[in-house]
């Protein structure tokens, strides 16, 4: 059974898509962003948006919570600020990253694969996961996210587009609408499982994806740059 309200801590790309899907089910949506600039287009679309941190907010009782605010070295800022209120939520969902698995050398990662975060961000994500799992939340580990305005098709149209090449490195991906659909289903089914990898099963090098996108648009592929020369 779907909730009557969604409250998204971090009303970003995925949360917006989920809110649009749930609107068709009669679910109201509200949430937070960090800046007035981010809030402006969301308010124009009709969503109830608050600025946080910086303003006091009270999530509505019995709402489904979706958390995607970036973690810090102490874990999730939302967890620290709202742990006491989390028991009033009808569902808790935390958006994490497949980066918590670390470098598997092209191997597959499954939900039961041991975590081996390498970057500071991934280490922080793993810590935040632990916090939300302690409250019974669903954790969704996401790969590269694409969709309208954020796809390889958009990138190859950019005047300064380039292909960063790192031999042997492959990524899985997920379309934003597929992620939102999975989140909606998780709200309905309330599975006893708590960790979900939402991604395709056709991992590919990032540069090959851009080449394919250019071919679809009858454009020349962007120039290639070795990763050690990319100044990332």
PLM segments and residue spans:
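Conserved N-terminal Rossmann-fold NAD(P)-binding element of oxidoreductases
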Residues: 5-11
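N-terminal Rossmann-fold NAD(P) dinucleotide-binding loop
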Residues: 15-16
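NAD(P)-cofactor binding segment of oxidoreductase domains
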Residues: 60-94, 127-130
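Conserved Rossmann-fold NAD(P)-dependent oxidoreductase catalytic core, especially the SDR/UDP-sugar
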Residues: 81-120
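Short-chain dehydrogenase/reductase
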Residues: 107-130, 169-173
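Conserved beta-loop-beta element that borders a ligand/cofactor-binding pocket
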Residues: 130-148
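Substrate-positioning beta->alpha
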Residues: 145-155, 164-187, 194
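Mid/C-terminal beta-alpha module of Rossmann-like enzyme folds, strongest
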Residues: 182-185, 189-232
């Amino acid at each position: 059974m779907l909730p009557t309200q969604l409250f998204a801590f971090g009303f970003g790309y995925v949360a917006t898509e989920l809110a649009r899907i749930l609107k068709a089910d009669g679910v109201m949506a509200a949430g937070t962003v960090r800046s007035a600039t981010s809030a402006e287009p969301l308010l124009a679309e009709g969503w109830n948006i608050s600025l946080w941190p910086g303003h006091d907010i009270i999530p509505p009782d019995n709402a489904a919570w979706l958390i995607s605010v970036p973690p810090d070295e102490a874990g999730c800022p939302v967890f620290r600020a709202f742990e006491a209120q989390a028991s009033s939520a009808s569902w808790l969902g935390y958006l994490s990253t497949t980066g918590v698995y670390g470098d598997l050398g092209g191997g597959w990662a499954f939900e039961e694969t041991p975590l081996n975060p390498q970057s500071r961000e991934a280490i922080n994500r793993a810590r935040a996961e632990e916090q939300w799992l302690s409250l019974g939340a669903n954790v969704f580990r996401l790969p590269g996210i694409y969709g309208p305005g954020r796809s390889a098709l958009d990138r190859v149209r950019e005047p300064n587009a380039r292909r960063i090449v790192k031999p042997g490195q492959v990524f899985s991906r997920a379309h934003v609408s597929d992620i939102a659909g999975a989140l909606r289903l998780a709200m309905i089914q309330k599975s006893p499982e708590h960790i979900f990898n939402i991604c395709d099963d056709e991992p590919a090098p990032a540069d090959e994806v851009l080449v394919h996108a250019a071919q679809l648009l009858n454009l020349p592929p962007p120039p290639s740059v070795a990763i050690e020369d990319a100044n990332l």
